[in-house]
């Protein structure tokens, strides 16, 4: 490998028309594109202040930095960029390059000789230490180092570069004549940033060190903040391989390769790139030069720590624990408290299912504050809040803790953690069943602008927090029957987080769940069953639960019961309280649909106790709703009504539309059952009130297109109208019932046994 390095760096060579200078000395080389940029700079200095307006000069100055730092682009693209900033100068540059390319070699020689004049005089046009001055000096020095044969090859490459640009310009002109699209001629804001696109990368030769550093930092920033604007995984890997071919010891390129491989879940390649990164970091002496032998040890312990994080991401917990132990051992030997704090945080992640994990987390937060590590301290507080939320702590205490965390965020401008904090508040309010508060927090996050500079015109980062908030927003709209709005949110999610991005699984699961609920509401159980496979692939527990729900709806009670019992045991082991309560409610429904309401009562009481203990208000209200229904079946409607008064307020305030309809339908059933013992005037009044509640329930069910429940409601209304002697209203409801009954399948379940 060493011989390859020597042939690459110490013997200047020509590859694809690009002349390399001594990389260790100059770390830059002359290319046809850079000659074109030099022509632009020369023309700018020759053009008087009156010839170019102040606005045009400002646009040109903004354009220069990305042109100097970015990779080589085609000549036609360069013309277009200059023309958008200053059309007059673009014409001058085009003429100058044409004269040079169609002239003789001495024209290029003379051009480089004249460049030195920019620094002469008492008031030079360009300062030597400025960005432009350094670029000019690098190019002059790199050109002066070339042999005659290399100069000739460079001139040949310039001619080829010009000819390719001319061909492209002619093709674009022909296309404009055939179809003139005003929108395409306008430059987008991201084009002003000269962001690296695939066609630009493919046309460029080997990058200089500055170009490579700019390319890597730009792509790393895009992968973190807006993955959709980064190169595709295949294109990025191709460019990184090209970089590493010319400089195998470029450590940062190996790290970006590691991040790129994580995008496609390639565990082998990502591990390979990560290990190469730390190997090259040690070999190049980047750490040891500044820190002596300490730098070598630092690389080793952070290599082990990153390896542990990588294994944890892929679910290899045993390997992650071994790597973490190695990192802790090396950090303790070096007395590196910062590394030990990171290790402590990862220890919590690996052992968070243990009963004593909160002690570890509290210790981690205290130590992080002590050593002045606000990022780790804040992450620890948020993890602690999440753990306490699942443990059933009160919302006010959790919000106070998050407020303390937010103070750290704003004090240290940790914008990423501000987003995470708001997304966490959204999730906590939904966990507690307060959909209005969750909606408010989600909208707050989406209306916030990022504190970090992303791209021109982009105010937000495409991070996990935004994906979580948008998913909550879609689900909340779907719960309220606003399916068109939910579809718009999901459409935005798909555009913002494409299927191959790392956070795409969030919206995929959200989309599948919404489709499943709609299919169940519409009575299309075969369609719902087909969606279960997709849900299971994304979340196995959710998938098994949904499968049981479908089986139950299809009257396959024994299969549903077996599945729910297995799921109950599994969720109790995992301490997934929310799912345990949902499973208990489903099992209870199985029992009363099998005409065994007395067996359902212990299940419901257990679910109520859990929801009260963990302060899951909405699930508690739903459990009370089920208890009231059980009491109705057992023949005590008065007690059922009194129970309903306890549960109905949270459901009407924060519940899903379907649950609101179920609650009002149950109230009507209880009113009718209670009215049996009333005298005639009072009974008629109670039945009228029941009909009003049934109308409200029908409106709720209509919003979510739940035809089966609408059929049950109109059947019940027809019976009540018949009792009250209202023939016309009875006939209208009976006709509607008949239409729905012919359209929908009937499973023969008695109406009284269906909540």
From Swiss-Prot:
Keywords, comma-separated and alphabetical: Cell cycle, Cell division, Cytoplasm, Cytoskeleton, Mitosis, Nucleus, Phosphoprotein, Repeat, TPR repeat, Ubl conjugation pathway
CDD domains: Apc5_N
GO cellular component: anaphase-promoting complex; cytosol; nucleoplasm; nucleus; spindle
Pathway(s) the chain acts in: Protein modification; protein ubiquitination
Recorded superkingdom: Eukaryota
Effect of residue 617 to H: In a breast cancer sample; somatic mutation
TPR repeats: 209-249, 250-300, 301-337, 338-378, 379-418, 419-466, 467-500, 501-540, 541-580, 581-620, 621-660, 661-696, 697-736
Iron keyword on record: no
Chief site of localization: nucleus
Cross-referenced Pfam families: ANAPC5 (PF12862), Apc5_N (PF21371)
Residues annotated with Phosphothreonine modification: 232
Keyword Phosphoprotein: yes
InterPro entries, per database record: Apc5, Apc5_dom, Apc5_N, TPR-like_helical_dom_sf, TPR_rpt
Gene Ontology MF annotations: protein phosphatase binding
Positions of post-translational Phosphoserine modification: 195
GO biological process: anaphase-promoting complex-dependent catabolic process; cell division; positive regulation of mitotic metaphase/anaphase transition; protein branched polyubiquitination; protein K11-linked ubiquitination; protein K48-linked ubiquitination; regulation of meiotic cell cycle; regulation of mitotic cell cycle
Subcellular location(s) per record: Nucleus; Cytoplasm, Cytoskeleton, Spindle
Family statement drawn from the similarity comment of this UniProt entry: Belongs to the APC5 family.
Biological role stated in the UniProt entry: Component of the anaphase promoting complex/cyclosome (APC/C), a cell cycle-regulated E3 ubiquitin ligase that controls progression through mitosis and the G1 phase of the cell cycle. The APC/C complex acts by mediating ubiquitination and subsequent degradation of target proteins: it mainly mediates the formation of 'Lys-11'-linked polyubiquitin chains and, to a lower extent, the formation of 'Lys-48'- and 'Lys-63'-linked polyubiquitin chains. The APC/C complex catalyzes assembly of branched 'Lys-11'-/'Lys-48'-linked branched ubiquitin chains on target proteins.
Subunit details: The mammalian APC/C is composed at least of 14 distinct subunits ANAPC1, ANAPC2, CDC27/APC3, ANAPC4, ANAPC5, CDC16/APC6, ANAPC7, CDC23/APC8, ANAPC10, ANAPC11, CDC26/APC12, ANAPC13, ANAPC15 and ANAPC16 that assemble into a complex of at least 19 chains with a combined molecular mass of around 1.2 MDa; APC/C interacts with FZR1 and FBXO5.
Domain notes: The TPR repeats are six to seven residues longer than a canonical TPR motif.
Protein name as annotated: Anaphase-promoting complex subunit 5
Organism: Homo sapiens
């Amino acid at each position: 490998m060493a011989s390859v390095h020597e042939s690459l760096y110490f013997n200047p060579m020509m590859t694809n028309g690009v002349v390399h200078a001594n990389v260790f000395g100059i770390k830059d080389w002359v290319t046809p594109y850079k000659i074109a940029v030099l022509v632009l700079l020369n023309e700018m200095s020759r053009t008087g202040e009156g010839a170019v307006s102040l606005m045009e000069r400002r646009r040109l100055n903004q354009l220069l930095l990305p042109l100097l730092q970015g990779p080589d682009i085609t000549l036609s693209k360069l013309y277009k960029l200059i023309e958008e900033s200053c059309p007059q100068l673009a014409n001058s540059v085009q003429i100058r390059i044409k004269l040079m390319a169609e002239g003789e070699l001495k024209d290029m020689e003379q051009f480089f000789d004249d460049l030195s004049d920019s620094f002469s005089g008492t008031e030079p046009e360009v300062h030597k230490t400025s960005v432009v001055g350094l670029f000019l000096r690098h190019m002059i020095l790199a050109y002066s180092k070339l042999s005659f044969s290399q100069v000739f090859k460079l001139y040949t490459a310039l001619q080829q570069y010009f000819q390719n640009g001319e061909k492209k310009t002619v093709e674009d002109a022909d296309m404009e004549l055939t179809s003139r699209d005003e929108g395409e001629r306008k430059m987008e804001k991201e084009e002003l940033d000269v962001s690296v696109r695939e066609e630009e990368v493919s046309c460029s030769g080997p990058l200089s060190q500055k170009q490579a550093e700019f390319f890597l930092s730009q792509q790393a920033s895009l992968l973190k903040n807006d993955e959709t604007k980064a190169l595709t995984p295949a294109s990025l890997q191709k460019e990184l391989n090209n970089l590493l071919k010319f400089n195998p010891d470029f450590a940062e390129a190996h790290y970006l390769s590691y991040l790129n491989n994580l995008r496609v879940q390639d565990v082998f390649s990502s591990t390979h790139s990560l290990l190469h990164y730390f190997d090259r970091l040690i070999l190049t002496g980047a750490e040891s030069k500044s820190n002596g032998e300490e730098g070598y040890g630092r690389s080793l312990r952070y290599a082990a720590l990153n390896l542990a994080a990588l294994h944890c991401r892929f679910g290899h917990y045993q390997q992650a624990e071994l790597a973490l132990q190695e990192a802790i051992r090396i950090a303790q030997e070096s007395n590196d408290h910062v590394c030990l704090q990171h290790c402590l945080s990862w220890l919590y992640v690996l052992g968070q299912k243990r009963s004593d994990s909160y002690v570890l987390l509290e210790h981690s937060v205290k130590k992080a504050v002590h050593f002045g590590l606000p990022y780790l301290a804040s992450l620890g507080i948020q993890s602690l809040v999440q753990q306490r939320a699942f443990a059933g702590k009160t919302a006010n205490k959790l919000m106070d803790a998050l407020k303390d965390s937010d103070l750290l965020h704003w004090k240290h401008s940790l914008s990423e953690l501000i987003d995470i904090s708001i997304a966490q508040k959204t999730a906590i309010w939904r966990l507690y069943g307060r959909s209005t508060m969750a909606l408010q927090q989600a909208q707050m996050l989406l209306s916030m602008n990022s504190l970090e500079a992303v791209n021109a015109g982009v105010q937000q980062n495409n991070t996990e927090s935004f994906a979580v908030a948008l998913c909550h927003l879609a689900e909340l709209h779907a719960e309220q029957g606003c399916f068109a709005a939910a579809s718009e949110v999901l459409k935005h999610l798909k555009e913002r987080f494409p299927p191959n991005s790392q956070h795409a699984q969030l919206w995929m699961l959200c989309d599948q769940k919404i489709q499943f609920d709609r299919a169940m509401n519409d009575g299309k159980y075969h369609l719902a069953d087909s969606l279960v496979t997709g849900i299971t692939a994304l979340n196995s527990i959710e998938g098994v639960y949904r499968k049981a729900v479908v089986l139950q709806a299809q009257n396959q009670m024994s299969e549903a019961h077996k599945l729910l019992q297995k799921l109950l045991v599994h969720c109790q082991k995992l301490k997934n309280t929310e799912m345990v309560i949902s499973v208990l409610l489903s099992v209870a429904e199985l029992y009363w649909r099998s005409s065994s309401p007395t067996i359902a009562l212990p299940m419901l009481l257990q679910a109520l106790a859990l929801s009260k203990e963990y302060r899951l208000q909405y699930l508690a209200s739903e459990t009370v709703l089920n208890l009231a229904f059980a009491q109705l079946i057992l023949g005590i409607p008065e007690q059922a009504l009194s129970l309903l008064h306890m549960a109905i307020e949270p459901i009407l305030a924060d519940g899903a539309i379907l649950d609101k309809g179920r609650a009002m339908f149950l109230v009507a059933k209880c009113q009718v059952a209670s009215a049996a013992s009333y005298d005639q005037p009072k009974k008629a009044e109670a039945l009228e009130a029941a009909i009003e509640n049934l109308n409200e329930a029908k409106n709720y069910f209509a919003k979510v297109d739940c035809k089966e429940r609408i059929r049950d409601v109109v059947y019940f209304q027809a019976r009540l109208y018949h009792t009250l002697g209202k023939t016309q209203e009875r006939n209208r409801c009976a006709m509607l019932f008949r239409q729905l009954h012919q359209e929908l399948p009937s499973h023969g379940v008695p109406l009284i046994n269906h909540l």
